[in-house]
């Protein structure tokens, strides 16, 4: 990440330092008079042993929030495992280092100990899990009675903004990251007196989230209404939503016994399941409209939507979600976790069986670690933005484990810890108050957020201002100054006539739009445990340590806003092309021409590219706050007549890096670094390590960095493979080599043009 400046450059930097009215739009802050806030980083999709993770709640919280020993600690954290049920007690700690007075180490037990062997089968509630049952505890019970109390205790003990969420197993689809925060972390937790002996009685609760899990998770077949087994003692939940007649529809599975829509099976299960999920969103909107969020996770992974199964999401399903609950369903995780896996993001060719036919993850793989829905300029994300929807981009870790390595090893052949590689930076308007679940969720909802991998950048201000002839004129320098002030203080803007991410700038026809971007590519090393030259960049003669990436360029992407699509219209629903109709055998794609009109926005294109040199070079500017160097850039969009949006992406990869980027700088398919098919591996890793860890050694943070290609890299194969027999870029090296950031959009709404209906 190091940038080298001459004395003259530093001196110059020091000088520089001086559509549809029927759609309900979410509530958002106006462009002026905002509550003060800062960009803070977090993660809302990760796992413990209560679902299918490898570690305890306590170990995960420590790994994720510690900024000294770890050291990639996040500013806020949502623990969110799968819905359904599980048999392991994630509240039991691994060792004495994690022991606390309320949750001490229990001899002979740990986070892989079953519920039956820790609390006893008789304490397991609901149907089927307790005495004589499977030993599995329903997630609603573990959230309500075990996981939430631990999270509240740790939040109070460590003074950290923590809360509990869920990776729902989605009816009709695969997974979504979500939470209902009602009841969680009341202000009284700030002054709670913590116990000095085992046990903690929380002041708040996760009852609303637990009820949602019971009512709507596809893997929850319990009909106990959240009660003690075989009794009416307990929650006595009723999932009826008086705001929706379909909430008790027998056609989609209503159970009078369970007072819920039960999971169904057989022909049409996907279609019925989707309708149930829409009801889940309506329930959230009606009962917890400002206290919940619902973000489809790794949504390309399970393939396209399957009306007779539970697979992926097509664009029409995202539209349905946003239409049903725009304050709740406002984005997606199109940059999945599992970044170190042998199939990056766990996206894979022929991953899924749909109707007996092996079917790719949508797009076949990721593209620079991002799913095709967002990575493809003009694709699904641009189609949604082209409607003027509040549909935002997020990234999360999906932490489970390190693959072939233990949880304390810095290497990985599967996952990264939350904050270690990917993080979402969100503007949280908490004023003088501490960070709290409500202000964090409010921040996510606004879309004033951006995501980066590998700490490629750690600050960003993205600003658009209107300029008119005469007294309303604005210079580039004046807008740059606004952005510099925001970026150097890790905050956003509060200026009339200007907007930032997740907002819209309302202008008169003919206005000039002045766009300024100021960001920081942080000096020094990132959190990679390697320090040898980046092998992907070595292909083009760039010698750059893999743990010191340098931002190569920033793309400004623009698209037109043409209004909301109408349900049932020909351009509302459309499936991304399957298998080789999109991703060909050689790893190239068929391009947007093969994508149906419903799933693309052909007006979207790269409008401007900034880099360190050339006609659109950024300018270094030294912060007056901490003396670090920021990069500033600006341009003008003249005489706008049509509503539109602009968004950003950037990478450490120049254009035309073999097997990484095309000639325009777009990310290529990650099949060339996915170790699940070694015949496709194409980038050799040749630096020999002089400190290669011996077999069985745990490589910890204290050991520093490995100075050559690690032994666990896959070996390329294939008679026609030019690097057959060589260690190839794969697993975590593929991820650390290839870094990207994505911003959310700024909308420009031109009077007498299309209304940007999704944003106030």
Model-derived features: positions:
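Gram-negative bacterial Sec-dependent N-terminal signal peptides
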Residues: 1-31
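Extended, charged catalytic domains and RNA/DNA-binding interfaces, predominantly
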Residues: 31-760
């Amino acid at each position: 990440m190091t940038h080298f400046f001459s004395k003259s450059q530093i001196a110059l930097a020091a000088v520089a330092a001086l559509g549809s009215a029927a759609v309900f739009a979410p509530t958002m802050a106006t462009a002026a008079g905002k509550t003060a806030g800062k960009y803070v980083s977090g993660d809302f999709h990760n796992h413990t042993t209560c679902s299918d993770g490898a570690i305890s709640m306590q170990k995960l919280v420590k790994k994720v929030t510690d900024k000294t020993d770890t050291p990639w600690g996040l500013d806020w954290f949502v623990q969110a495992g799968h819905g359904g049920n599980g048999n392991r007690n994630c509240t039991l700690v691994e060792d004495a280092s994690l022991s606390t007075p309320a949750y001490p180490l229990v001899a002979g037990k740990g986070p892989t100990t079953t519920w039956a062997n820790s609390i006893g089968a008789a304490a397991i509630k609901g149907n089927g899990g307790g005495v004589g049952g499977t030993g599995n505890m329903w997630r609603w019970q573990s959230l309500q009675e075990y996981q939430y109390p631990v999270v509240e205790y740790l939040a109070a003990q460590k003074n950290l903004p923590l809360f509990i969420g869920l990776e729902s197993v989605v009816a009709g689809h695969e997974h979504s990251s979500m939470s209902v925060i009602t009841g969680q972390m009341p202000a009284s937790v700030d002054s709670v007196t913590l116990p000095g002996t085992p046990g903690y009685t929380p002041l708040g609760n996760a009852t609303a989230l637990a009820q949602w899990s019971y009512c709507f998770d596809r893997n929850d077949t319990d009909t106990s209404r959240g009660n003690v087994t075989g009794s009416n003692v307990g929650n006595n939940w009723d999932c009826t939503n008086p705001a929706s007649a379909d909430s008790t529809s027998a056609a989609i599975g209503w159970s009078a016994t369970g007072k819920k829509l039960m999971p169904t099976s057989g022909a049409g299960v996907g279609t019925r399941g989707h309708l149930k999920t829409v009801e889940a969103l309506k329930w959230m909107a009606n009962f917890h409209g400002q206290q919940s969020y619902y973000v489809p996770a790794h949504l390309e992974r399970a393939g396209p939507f399957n009306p007779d199964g539970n697979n992926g999401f097509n664009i029409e399903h995202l539209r349905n979600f946003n239409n049903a609950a725009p304050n709740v369903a406002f984005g997606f995780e199109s940059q999945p976790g599992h970044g170190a896996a042998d199939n990056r993001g766990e996206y894979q060719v022929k991953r899924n069986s749909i109707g007996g036919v092996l079917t790719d993850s949508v797009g076949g793989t990721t593209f620079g670690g991002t799913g095709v829905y967002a990575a493809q300029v003009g694709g699904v994300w641009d189609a949604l933005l082209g409607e003027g929807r509040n549909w935002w981009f997020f990234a999360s870790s999906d932490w489970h484990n390190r693959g072939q390595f233990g949880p304390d090893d810095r290497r990985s052949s599967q996952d990264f810890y939350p904050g270690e590689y990917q993080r979402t930076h969100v503007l949280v308007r908490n004023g003088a108050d501490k960070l709290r679940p409500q202000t964090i969720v409010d921040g996510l909802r606004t879309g004033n957020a951006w995501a980066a991998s590998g700490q490629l950048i750690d600050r960003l201000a993205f600003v658009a201002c209107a300029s008119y002839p005469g007294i309303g004129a604005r210079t580039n320098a004046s807008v740059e100054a606004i952005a510099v002030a925001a970026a150097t203080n890790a905050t956003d803007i509060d200026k009339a006539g200007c907007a930032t991410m997740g907002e819209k700038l309302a202008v008169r026809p003919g206005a000039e739009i002045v766009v300024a971007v100021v960001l920081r590519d942080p000096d020094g090393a990132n959190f990679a445990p390697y320090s040898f030259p980046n092998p992907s960049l070595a292909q083009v003669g760039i010698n750059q340590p893999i743990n010191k990436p340098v931002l190569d360029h920033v793309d400004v992407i623009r698209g037109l806003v043409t209004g909301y699509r109408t349900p049932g219209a020909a351009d509302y629903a459309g499936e991304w092309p399957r298998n080789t109709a999109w991703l060909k055998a050689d790893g190239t794609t068929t391009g947007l021409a093969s994508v149906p009109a419903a799933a693309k926005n052909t007006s979207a294109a790269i409008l401007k590219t900034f880099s360190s040199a050339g006609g659109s070079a950024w300018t270094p500017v030294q912060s007056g706050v901490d003396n670090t160097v920021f990069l500033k850039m600006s341009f003008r969009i003249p005489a706008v007549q049509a509503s539109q949006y602009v968004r950003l992406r950037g990478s450490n990869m120049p254009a035309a890096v073999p097997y990484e980027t095309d000639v325009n700088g777009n990310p290529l398919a990650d099949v060339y670094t996915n170790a699940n098919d070694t015949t496709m591996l194409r980038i050799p890793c040749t630096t020999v390590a002089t400190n290669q860890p011996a077999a069985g050694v745990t490589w910890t943070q204290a050991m520093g960095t490995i100075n050559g290609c690690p032994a666990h890299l896959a070996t390329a194969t294939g008679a026609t493979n030019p690097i057959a027999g060589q260690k190839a870029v794969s697993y975590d090296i593929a991820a650390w080599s290839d870094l990207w950031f994505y911003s959310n959009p700024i909308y420009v709404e031109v009077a007498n043009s299309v209304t940007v209906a999704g944003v106030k």
